[in-house]
Amino acid sequence: MNDNRHRSKPPASLAPRDLAALIDISAVQAFHTEADVRELAEIAVAEGFIAAHALPNFVPLLRSLVPPGGPTLVGGPVGFPSGGHTTRMKIAEASELAEGGAQELDMMINVGRLKSGDIGYVRSEIRAVVEAIAPVPLKVILELAHLTDEEIRTASAIVAESGAAFVKTGTGWTPSATTLERLKLIAVTVEGAVEIKAAGGIRSLDAIAEMLRLGVTRFGINTQVAVDLVRQCAALPGSRLDIAGKAD
């Protein structure tokens, strides 16, 4: 049920540390190495990014490198990147990651089942994983590049009622950038019942400000781009990013 718990307005402006506290960085491409994960942890902690994510086999290492009790959470992906794993596989993977120290998980939705109209399967799978890892929060990835507008609405509604913490736009494994138009579809559908994480092609402070005004509360951004954006924020007048801007 929609309880509007996430509908608070965004702040009027953000300082660099506030911005970093909205950004996840990651090393989840197939070619990322142990050295990349170590660098990821170092950057995440130094910059105060809210989360760092690594591929499942590197999550224990990442957990050991990020100080407990600090501002940076450790996360990992589930059913990544295709979403085509069975529900039992996703539960097992998510449970192992949670037991290994992951503090939040991003799970790929089963796109094939969604596009086949098997809504019951998609809904029950998300709920099963949410229950298996509770209280670890789950973000559900839609991969918008593969979906029609109607499928985005359907998937967003499923996530909103599933007990997941976030609906997320994409994995970062497709070339398509997240657009404002498709974010609006998600925001209008979920009506604040679940938080929104935008990921994919976010490369400017203006885009972040616009997305925050739409209701986005978390961003997945390329590590170097994220560092650059925090630096750009620090260079703005008063070292603050204006969010209030023109309302849509």
Curated annotation (Swiss-Prot):
A GO molecular function held by the record: deoxyribose-phosphate aldolase activity
Catalytic activity from the UniProt record: 2-deoxy-D-ribose 5-phosphate = D-glyceraldehyde 3-phosphate + acetaldehyde
Pfam family, one: DeoC
GO CC annotation: cytoplasm
Subcellular location: Cytoplasm
Enzyme class: lyase
Classification via InterPro entries: Aldolase_TIM, DeoC, DeoC/FbaB/LacD_aldolase, DeoC_typeI
Record-level GO BP terms: 2-deoxyribose 1-phosphate catabolic process; carbohydrate catabolic process; deoxyribonucleotide catabolic process
Keyword Lyase recorded: yes
Main localization category: cytoplasm
Catalytic residues as annotated in Swiss-Prot or TrEMBL: D106, K168, K197
Keywords: Cytoplasm, Lyase, Schiff base
Annotated S-S bridges: none
Record-listed E.C. numbers: 4.1.2.4
Taxonomy, superkingdom: Bacteria
Pathway: Carbohydrate degradation; 2-deoxy-D-ribose 1-phosphate degradation; D-glyceraldehyde 3-phosphate and acetaldehyde from 2-deoxy-alpha-D-ribose 1-phosphate: step 2/2
Coiled coil (UniProt feature): none
Family the entry assigns: Belongs to the DeoC/FbaB aldolase family. DeoC type 1 subfamily.
Summary of the function given for this chain in its UniProt record: Catalyzes a reversible aldol reaction between acetaldehyde and D-glyceraldehyde 3-phosphate to generate 2-deoxy-D-ribose 5-phosphate.
Protein name: Deoxyribose-phosphate aldolase
Species this protein is from: Sinorhizobium medicae (strain WSM419)
